[in-house]
Amino acid sequence: MIKFHFTLIFCFAFFLSYGGAISNQLSNDIKTGEIKVNVKKIAPEPVKWDTEIRELIFDDDDELKDGSHFMELFTPYRAADAAIVPISIKFRKNQNEEDFVKYITIVADENPSPIIGKFEFSLKTGKSDFSTRIRIDKYTYVRAIAEMNNGEKYMVSNYVKAAGGCSAPSLADMDTVMARLGKMKMKLIETGEVGQLNKAQFIISHPNFSGLQFNQLTRSEIPAHFVDSIKVTQDNETILNITSDISLSEDPSFTFHYLNTGGELDVTVTDSQGGVFSNKWPIEQILSSK
């Protein structure tokens, strides 16, 4: 009993000495937004990746290296909307002839179709940073896998808390969605003279139905209807070539870079129901519409 009382007194004294400081520090961290959480410590083991998905993409003898020394994946830890989850990939160096990113594969382990898309780059891309928006079906690891021109493969991943994105209804009614199908917009975010690195954003109006959604009026299933390829060129040189599946968000959007050679930007999009959409934007036309 004496030992118990001594322990209680010691704990009380410790709280008086340090409790206020801990409380004040926590309060300050909350106010300044500087609370840091080590996601790797609280995220679950990547069981599905280890047992199922890795072998869908790679051969057994493929070496997959940690890419955190030269690339970074940005995702929300907890997404505000699982149907529109923003992701960005940034690299610490530009494309060059000796060492450049050839492909990036985006994966969400727990999605019904885990391979979200494969993005092909070239020296014309200049810099392989890009951003897009994806659907997430349940809490999952999101991965970016870069394949270099020499065949080496690197991966970075984040754990994202989001659910229901693959079956979430469209943002508008069916008639409105289909009326604007295939409409495109190109926006220059950064532009310069010929030979300089430009940055642009491309958006296409498309429902990107996953096949898991229901018509909100009839409650009938909506067949899958999604963008499955996008190709962006300038002066007959490929800037970006995308092969995608059901996990891109409605109205797919991509931000990308390219080395400007002065010609118009040419985009061709196809979808899973045979739709083909194309458009061209002279640089001057894009600049005048800014």
Pin down the residues of each PLM region.
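N-terminal edge beta-strand
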Residues: R54-A82, D175-V194
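Beta-strand signatures of extracellular beta-sandwich domains
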Residues: Y103-V107, S229-T233, T268
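Short acidic/polar inter-strand loop motif in beta-rich domains
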Residues: M148-M155, D271-K280
